[in-house]
Amino acid sequence: MGVRKFVPTRSAAPVPGARVLGLTIDSEFEVAQHIAAGFSATTIGRLARELGVPDKRMLTLTNIPESTYFDRKRRNKPLSAETSSRVYRIAKATEAAEAYFEGDKDAARRWLINPKVSIGGKTPLEFACTPEGSDYVIKLLTRMEHGIIS
């Protein structure tokens, strides 16, 4: 018996957040590498457009000063790993909301930008900026999908 080449019959599940950020990646390991290296500064604008919010709002959410953002963008320098991580968490929550609303980006955006009692009157977008907050937003969407009132 000879050695046979493995040919996968299915592709891997998409990596959460990758589509929104325009990343062509196959694993969360690659996400971690991209975050460590720093996303392109233009990623913030891309995410802002996806959510229909001004770039300035995204800068506030990701805690990056305008001057730093424009300097990095102008000099084609990557975002810090910390900022890239915040951007990724928002992207993951965005994709989770879009999945919950069955691809209706407007409904997902409205849900993300409107305050919710279940998260202390904050918007899911604001809450998604920390690892725990992002996880909570995604779990909240999962509970809603299964009819569990939060």
Model-derived segments and spans:
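Non-transmembrane "mature" sequence context
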Residues: 1-150
